[in-house]
Amino acid sequence: MGVSRPPSTPASKIERTPMSTPTPGGSTRVKEEKIFVTVRVRPLSKKELALKDQVAWECDDNQTILYKGPPQDRAAPTSYTFDKVFGPASQTEVVYEEGAKDVAMSALTGINATIFAYGQTSSGKTFTMRGVTESAVNDIYRHIENTPERDFIIKISAMEIYNEIVKDLLRPESTNLRLLDDPEKGTIVEKLEEEIAKDSQHLRHLISICEEQRQVGETALNDTSSRSHQIIRLTVESRLREVSGCVKSFVANLNFVDLAGSERAAQTHAVGARLKEGCHINRSLLTLTTVIRKLSSDKRSGHIPYRDSKLTRILQLSLGGNARTAIICTMSPAQTHVEQSRNTLFFATCAKEVTNNAKVNMVVSDKQLVKHLQMEVARLEAELRTPDRASSSEIIIMERDRKIRQMEKEMEELKKQRDNAQLKLEELQKKMGDNQPGWNPFDSPQRTRKCLTYSGSLQPSNKMKIRSSIRQSATAPFMLKHEIRKLEQLQQQLEVEANRAIEVLHKEVECHKHGNQDAAETIAKLQAEIRGMQSVRSDRDVDMITDEGNGSDLKEEISRLHMQDNDIAKLEAKLENVQRSIDRLVMSLPNVGTQCNETTPKSNRAKKKKRMLLPLGVSNINRPNLIRAPCSPLSSSRPLEPEVENRAPEGDTVSHEGSERATPTKSEDTGDVSSRDETPRYRRSSSVNMKKMQKMFQNAAEENVRNIRAYVTELKERVAKLQYQKQLLVCQVLELESNEGKTNDMEEDSEENAGSLQDGPDSWDRLFKEQMQHIIQLWDLCHVSIIHRTQFYLLFRGDRADQIYIEVEVRRLTWLQQHFAEVGDASPAAGDDSTISLASSIKALRNEREFLARRMGSRLTEEERERLFIKWQVPLEAKQRKLQLVNRLWTDPNDQAHIDESADIVARLVGFCEGGNISKEMFELNFAVPASRKPWLMGWQPISNMIREKTQLW
């Protein structure tokens, strides 16, 4: 099967691009996206329709699937949402177009892609994957025809994992292939054959060969069940036809993964080799589910068991790695497969949370890569030797412009300062000539140093000093303004720190609403005073700006400075009060003061419990931040924003009020420490005990309700059994008395009873046919044993004495139908043989049919079997023909000929014809299925046994 390969770049000469390799456009093509998950619900199969299985799942819309079956024992979700949901009427082409096409076509642009088919056995995985693969091949070659500027090479390789052994599907003679770890390619399969597809027909031929070589077997659920995992890998390489400076090509893998279905041995009845295959399949699928579940969780740092299975090891890149992945989950809507369907939906729910990191895989040959790098080095060397004058001159000009703009700004600032100084000097010279009597600047030397305005009446001896001071006053405004700004900055810092301290205290008091009232009032006063100081200061700032604009003198500046000094002193005094208020508030908080020195385990436990109950704003975590003085000089360099952020917001006061019932607050602890120590500690424990008692009472009440419901159900069943036993005893007595004829009175009574039961031959025949038809309908609805049906149908043929049996059977089936309607499809508890359900009836009927199918080999000859196969239209090439024949018996309750033939075949298989005359009231003592112990599925046999035991005791 070898095919000549065209010349291409060897694998050893290909350098794969890393995760952050830039694209020609300059950006990295690393794409993060989640797995695209779709769910396809198949229609009911022929076997499920023959067993009258119910539909339990419906597609609400194209993204939601709903559970419509009877309620389950355990709590489970009733609706699931996915990227796409396809109902039973959807076609495979639609599934491919909306669920897998986008992922499959990404392989043509250099992105790895994988398409999974996951689901239980006989759910339609292989059917779906065949259609998806065929559609993908058509689209790939259609894209190749529409892209003439690129050359494409399609390579195919295929493998199957059968019993954890990797085999090459293109080489049937291949043995167990080893898995190797490659640092660049990941996990590879050693000696795996890879063929180059010449065209689409050749590729389809190779795919068909792979499907023929796959392991297929027969199970009870599927005649052609896939017994291995199949992986068909298409490697797509493309390169430009035109030769460029650095020829790049794309390479990507497209995997079509058809998984084997999960199965239960109880349903497939697998033994021997089939059981071994099922064990390996379930083990590998369990590993796949574990990997998906761990990848879907938030914490992906833990160990992910890729190497626990060869399936997950080969597909590691497709699971959370460098690939785009689409998963098509197939499921059956039947009620009998509800648990397997839920497991499939759980897998799909986890899979849609897995994130892959897909990238474009570009490869460059070594020869052309070296040539490209040499050209790049030559270009850089040329730039270093002859720098670009234009670019360098532009940079120099921009730098000079920036410096010029900066110098212009500085010159404008200097001009403003010069103008202000000249203005101040002119005002000073003008006011020095004014006469101001009553004030002598030389009376107070300190005042002379602070004030720079002088009167006109000066002594001649001091005129020279005044002239020198005037010459020096030109630089005084700058120094004075600098000092004023320093003082203003100090005041602002103190105000900011005071406000922060007040906010901290205010929030703490808000958390303790019933706290110290004195501290709260002090804080409110301090806040009002600081706001007043800020408003006054803002007014002064406005006045200062206005006065500076109008040319105010330095005397007003100095007076304002004195007032600011007084304000700063007042502010410092107020901040001292704030510090003392902080200390008092901290000492009044719980677990502070003398309680901090308690080291007993009991107190420590109480503190821990209280700390857990209190919100974050009043916890002990933030109390050390309150003890530090926010107004101290060292605190100015320490930011307080993290401390404020760690406190509870104002909106949390409601939650704190709700927790006051369980947490002792400051209002409960008013007084000294000793009063808090004397508070009884059993209050909190009593509240906890009350909660425990309430929980115990609730659990006890629920348990009592369940016990009462079970007891009532058991009583109903016992009453029904006693009623049937009573009626059967009456039948036995009537028949014995009529046969023996002991007394005339009893004979007259029996004749009267017989007379009362009949009005005429025609009416009784008509009534018997109607009741028998009603019984047959109920047999079919309740899935009653076909052995019981045959026995009853052959024994009671319309005799007037049979009316009591007919009536008892009608009542029994009516009660059974009502019981199924009430119980639903709930499975009986372990060890409870008296509780039955519709599911248990179906299971017992299925086991009975299998029992009869096995008896056909010993009870019927080969010629009889062949005649029956032809008569019942069982195909000659069909699998399990005997079971198919038995499954067709007693399936049409409206066809009288069908019922007669079914009863005849069952009677021959069980041996009714060999027993001779059988007593009607003991009709099912000899021909019951020994495996079943449920009385209502067995018909009347257990009741008859109980009657016989009672009569022997009497």
UniProtKB/Swiss-Prot annotation:
SUPFAM superfamilies from the UniProt entry: P-loop containing nucleoside triphosphate hydrolases
Family matches, as PROSITE patterns: KINESIN_MOTOR_2
Compositionally biased tracts (Basic and acidic residues): 640-660, 666-681
Gene Ontology process terms (BP): cell division; microtubule-based movement
Annotated coiled-coil segments of the chain: 363-436, 480-588
GO cellular component: microtubule
Region (Disordered), start-end ranges: 1-29, 624-689, 741-762
Domain Kinesin motor: 34-354
Chain sites annotated for binding ATP: 119-126
GO molecular function: ATP binding; microtubule binding; microtubule motor activity
Superkingdom as given in the UniProt entry: Eukaryota
InterPro entries: Kinesin-like_fam, Kinesin_motor_dom, Kinesin_motor_dom_sf, NACK_C, P-loop_NTPase
Tagged with keyword Nucleotide-binding: yes
Low complexity bias spans: 17-28, 630-639
Tissue note: Ubiquitous with a preferential expression in the shoot apical meristem (SAM).
Keywords: ATP-binding, Cell cycle, Cell division, Coiled coil, Microtubule, Motor protein, Nucleotide-binding
Disulfide bonds: none
Function: May be essential to promote the progression of cytokinesis during node-internode differentiation.
Family note: Belongs to the TRAFAC class myosin-kinesin ATPase superfamily. Kinesin family. KIN-7 subfamily.
Name the record gives this protein: Kinesin-like protein KIN-7A
Upper classification of the organism: Eukaryota, Viridiplantae, Streptophyta, Embryophyta, Tracheophyta
Underlying gene: KIN7A
